[in-house]
């Protein structure tokens, strides 16, 4: 769903009303809910950075990529429907950003490192993709952090 903060808030309240759930917390970029014992986060933006310049670049990068990500549909097993999943190149950049965010704001756990490991491992990098990836990471201020990982 490509929606603004108010639309996300309305969706959250609608979901909890229809499922006897509850709204747990709200932060700058998400609203947390519990539905049938399952914790869910609805994001108005997938991420943000404290540095004004890099945050602006990140928001533009996310907007440029939203259609490709929302349109990348994958069939679930047993014919249970389809879901949108990130493209491999987007996922590689986003998971590194996510790891970066945890490093500076919430603490990094093995979970975030393993998530990034599997994304990078699955994404067979050829020279053309590597060049594009390097450009995006430099643009977003993540290139040196990538070197540390």
Q: Language-model segments: which ranges?
A:
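Conserved NTP-donor binding/palm subdomain of two-metal-ion nucleotidyltransferases/polymerases, i.e.
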Residues: 3-149
